[in-house]
C-alpha cells in the first residue's frame, strides 16, 4: 500500500514524505503501552477490525476451536479484544470459561490465561480443547472448577503465584436463553432478570 502511494505521488515533496513514513514504519516501533500494536505501522494490521460494527462472515474453526458446546464465544471476539487491550505474557481472566475459547486464544497470542468454570464436566471439555492447541509461546493456562459468584479471586491468584491480571473478559449466559445446567448457582437458572443481574454483579465485584 505504501509503495503504491509513493508511485502515485505527483511531487518530489510528497514522494519524500511517503518514503520517510515508510522507513519509519519499518525501522521504528511505537506502542501505546496497552498492547503490542506498532502505531507506526498500524495500516498493516488489516485483520484488526477498526469499525464499530464487527461483521464476521464465519466463525473461526481452526486448530482446537469448535462449536460443539452451545453458547460459546465466537473466537474472533476474544482475539480482537486480547490484541487490542493486552500485551504478550500478560494475564487474562475469564470467569465464564465454558469450553475454553478465551484460553485457546491466549495460547495463540502469547497471553497467560485463567479460566473459571462452574460445571466439572465442562471443565474437562475445556482442558481437552485447550490442550490440543499448540503452546508456541510457552504461556500458562490455569483452569479452576468453581463458582465465580462466590470465589475469592485474590486468594486463587495468590495460590497460583500470580500478583495481578491485566484483562478481564466475560461472556456470561444470556439469562435463560440457554439452560446450561441444573445447578442453582448457574446464572442461566436465575429466577428473574433481577436475580440474574445480582449474580452477575457478584462476579464483577469478586473480580
Q: What does each model-identified segment do?
A:
Residues 1-207:
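Class I S-adenosyl-L-methionine-dependent methyltransferase catalytic core
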Amino acid at each position: 500500500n505504501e509503495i503504491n502511494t509513493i508511485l502515485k505521488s505527483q511531487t518530489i515533496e510528497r514522494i519524500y514524505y511517503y518514503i520517510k513514513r515508510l522507513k519509519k514504519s519499518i525501522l521504528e516501533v511505537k506502542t501505546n503501552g496497552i498492547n503490542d500494536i506498532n502505531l507506526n505501522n498500524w495500516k498493516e494490521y488489516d485483520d484488526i477490525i477498526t469499525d464499530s460494527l464487527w461483521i464476521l462472515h464465519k466463525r473461526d474453526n481452526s486448530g482446537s476451536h469448535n462449536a460443539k458446546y452451545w453458547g460459546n464465544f465466537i473466537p474472533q471476539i476474544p482475539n480482537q479484544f486480547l490484541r487490542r487491550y493486552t500485551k504478550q505474557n500478560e494475564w487474562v481472566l475469564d470467569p465464564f470459561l465454558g469450553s475454553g475459547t478465551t484460553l485457546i486464544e491466549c495460547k495463540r497470542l502469547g497471553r497467560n490465561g485463567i479460566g473459571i468454570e462452574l460445571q466439572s464436566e465442562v471443565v474437562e471439555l475445556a482442558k481437552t480443547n485447550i490442550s490440543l492447541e499448540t503452546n508456541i509461546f510457552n504461556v500458562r493456562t490455569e483452569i479452576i472448577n468453581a463458582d465465580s459468584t462466590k470465589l475469592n479471586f485474590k486468594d486463587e491468584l495468590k495460590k497460583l503465584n500470580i500478583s495481578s491480571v491485566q484483562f478481564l473478559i466475560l461472556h456470561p449466559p444470556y439469562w435463560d436463553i440457554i439452560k446450561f445446567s441444573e445447578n442453582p448457582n448457574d446464572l442461566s437458572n436465575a429466577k428473574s432478570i433481577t436475580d440474574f443481574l445480582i449474580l452477575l454483579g457478584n462476579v464483577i465485584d469478586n473480580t
